[in-house]
Swiss-Prot record:
A Gene Ontology BP annotation from the UniProt entry: unsaturated fatty acid biosynthetic process
Protein name, entry field: 3-hydroxydecanoyl-[acyl-carrier-protein] dehydratase
Organism per entry: Xanthomonas campestris pv. campestris (strain ATCC 33913 / DSM 3586 / NCPPB 528 / LMG 568 / P 25)
GO molecular function: (3R)-hydroxyacyl-[acyl-carrier-protein] dehydratase activity; trans-2-decenoyl-acyl-carrier-protein isomerase activity
HAMAP family: FabA (MF_00405)
Location(s) in or outside the cell: Cytoplasm
Matches recorded under PANTHER family: 3-HYDROXYACYL-[ACYL-CARRIER-PROTEIN] DEHYDRATASE, 3-HYDROXYDECANOYL-[ACYL-CARRIER-PROTEIN] DEHYDRATASE
Length: 171
């Protein structure tokens, strides 16, 4: 598939099935772990580092699966799901630029949570700025990211790392 600068939910789910970039390319997780509904912008020269920018959105609805179990009587989106979305998007970037293999989160330097996503919210926006791409024996991207709920930043992460592996048997 030719690289696009935006992707619909159907296209993201095709990525989960290995149909968007091919069966041997990196994949996004399928529902319910896919943590965004669309990528509204992706490029390989934007962001504050000039190495790539991804913007994505998740529509918040009270019936989202995590509100029913986290927590009963006090529903809130788990912070780890927002962090995972940042890793998902960083990995998608690597697949989008043609890096071979399957993506795996390798860590992050710093994470801050300064708010929460409640069922009354309407929109989560992710902004991922690629700070480094290594494309040698090790294929890895490093990024800085933030997550906004209804326009207010509530999560920030620095030095997110995702690697691509042609074999994950010994990972």
């Amino acid at each position: 598939m030719t690289r696009q600068n935006a992707y619909s939910r159907d296209q993201l789910l095709a990525s989960a099935r290995g149909e968007l970039f091919g069966p041997n390319s990196g994949r996004l997780p399928n529902d319910p772990m896919l943590m965004f509904d669309r990528i509204t912008e992706i490029n390989d020269n934007g962001g504050s580092h000039g190495k790539g920018l991804i913007r994505a959105e998740l529509d918040i609805r009270p019936d989202l699966w995590f509100f029913n179990c986290h927590f009963i009587g006090d529903p809130v989106m788990p912070g780890c799901l927002g962090l995972d979305a940042m890793w998902q998007l960083t990995g998608f970037f690597l697949t989008w630029i043609g890096a071979p293999g399957r993506g795996r989160a390798l860590g992050c330097g710093e994470v801050k949570f300064t708010g929460q996503v409640l069922p009354t919210a309407t929109l989560v926006t992710y902004e991922i700025e690629i700070s480094r791409v290594i494309n040698r024996k090790l294929v890895m991207a490093q990024s800085d990211a933030r997550m906004l709920v209804d326009g207010r930043e509530i999560y920030a992460a620095k030095d997110l790392r995702v690697g691509m592996f042609t074999s994950t048997e010994n990972f």
